[in-house]
């Protein structure tokens, strides 16, 4: 979920003024940071972390970050990312699903509008990126958690670190764009230009929207969903602190985390993400291109 500003504000609101804001802000990028890798393997891993064995990985992150204050703030930011995604993504997917199916471009536009909405009422600037030594330490802990979660991963630590740096750099630029007046323009499935604006978000919510996974109709909009996300973030941070103090074991922590998909907000095994319309179109173009190429060779 590329709502950088919303993720960061949720994490820093829950963690308070005494946290390491740079580390927590990087943690608030969650698994999205891996999408900024130049390596397809890391991007694919980022996708899997959103919708497979989610509680298990979060426990590994907390374990890997337990003995360093800045890394603990990073891990709690990561928990906040999970809480915000679980709260908001059903709404985002509902708004991104059109007659022909789910559109990843409209998903992005919706999340930019969410950032614009929150930046418009918050007006708090984004946190700065962690310094080099802090990023190196966080990178090592994140890499350790990944290897615990998937031991056969061929992890390039240098590329993982580059992804973290790009995430904070490009994420900051996108966060500022999210606060600009106006809306992000996208094309619908008929090729007609559409807008997704902050005002549309609340109007869509008030008209009632259907959760794509549960079928439940809701009128909750950005304010209600943000309230739910902040409440859940507070619960997860409290559980993490109990775990670090030895007052909660890993199995209990997993139960508190809920093992939910970041995308559906439901149990990950029973709520696979929809395939974007754009992916099907890309495959169709590739088939036509490869067919024409093979005919030319003959």
Predicted feature locations:
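N-terminal leader/auxiliary helical segments
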Residues: 1-76, 83-298
């Amino acid at each position: 979920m590329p709502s950088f500003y919303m993720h960061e504000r949720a994490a820093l609101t829950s963690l308070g003024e005494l946290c390491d804001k740079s580390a927590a802000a990087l943690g608030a990028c969650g698994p999205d940071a891996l999408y900024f890798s130049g390596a397809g393997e890391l991007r694919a891993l980022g996708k899997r972390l959103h919708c497979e064995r989610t509680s298990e990985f979060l426990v590994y992150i907390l374990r890997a970050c337990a003995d360093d204050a800045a890394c603990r703030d990073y891990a709690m930011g990561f928990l906040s990312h999970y809480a915000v995604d679980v709260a908001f993504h059903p709404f985002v997917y509902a708004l991104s699903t059109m007659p022909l199916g789910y559109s990843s471009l409209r998903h992005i536009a919706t999340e930019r509008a969410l950032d614009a909405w929150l930046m418009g009422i918050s007006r708090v600037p984004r946190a700065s990126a962690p310094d080099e030594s802090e990023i190196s330490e966080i990178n090592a802990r994140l890499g350790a958690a990944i290897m615990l979660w998937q031991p056969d991963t061929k992890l390039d630590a240098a590329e993982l670190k580059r992804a973290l740096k790009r995430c904070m750099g490009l994420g900051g630029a996108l966060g500022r764009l999210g606060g600009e007046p106006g809306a992000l323009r996208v094309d619908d499935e008929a090729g007609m230009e559409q807008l997704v604006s902050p005002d549309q978000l609340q109007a869509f919510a008030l008209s009632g929207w259907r959760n794509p996974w549960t079928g439940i109709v809701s009128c909750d909009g950005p304010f209600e969903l943000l309230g739910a996300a902040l409440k859940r973030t507070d619960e997860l941070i409290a559980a993490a602190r109990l775990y670090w103090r030895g007052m909660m074991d890993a199995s209990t922590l997993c139960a508190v985390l809920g093992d939910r998909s970041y995308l559906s907000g439901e149990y990950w095994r029973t709520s696979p993400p929809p395939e974007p319309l754009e992916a099907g179109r890309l495959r169709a173009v590739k088939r036509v291109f490869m067919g024409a190429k093979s005919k030319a060779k003959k």
